[in-house]
Amino acid sequence: TCMAEMKPLVKSVIEEIAGQTPIFKRPNQAGDYSFNNIGLSSFYMLSSTMPDDIRAEKGYYAVSGCGGNIAWHTENDTLEIADKEVLLRDIRIYLLSILRLTQFKFLPVDWRMLTAEFAETLQEYQAACGDAFDLAPASAGVGALDAALERLDAGIAGGSVSAEAANAARRDL
């Protein structure tokens, strides 16, 4: 899982380290995400969860947050039952992500992916509520933010916005 604005970073790291194309899902407000909405973009909740087909093949039940280890949060949850290759891969994923978040010219956050998600959600809500409620003002606000972000990105690409100014704007968002 990851927030929309982190998809480019997550995609590049997962492809480089794991050789896989990530499947994106917006994080649930659960577990380590209980404190979502404090201004931190998040990613990698359930990153090594066993795929449903493999879990079914093994006869395991669904558990979240542990990669599919059915001993999770029991007295049997000890290091020797962990899949060391998965642990090493996860460590590499986390370290490369941290490196890219801390050693950058431009902060690797794409806020326009978030505005696209907001716009899509507003369209779905408008379709669901029909004429009972008008979400046009909210949609206009998202559109205005997206246009401002497009100008910022164009300024970055064209060199008229410095890395310092771009990163300050991205952090402030």
Question: What does each model-found stretch correspond to?
Answer:
Residues 1-71, 83, 129-172:
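Metal-dependent peptidase/peptidase-like ectodomains
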Residues 16, 100-104, 124:
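A structural signal for alpha-helix termini and helix-coil/disorder junctions
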Residues 51-119:
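His/Asp/Glu-rich mid-to-C-terminal helical/loop segments that flank catalytic regions of hydrolases
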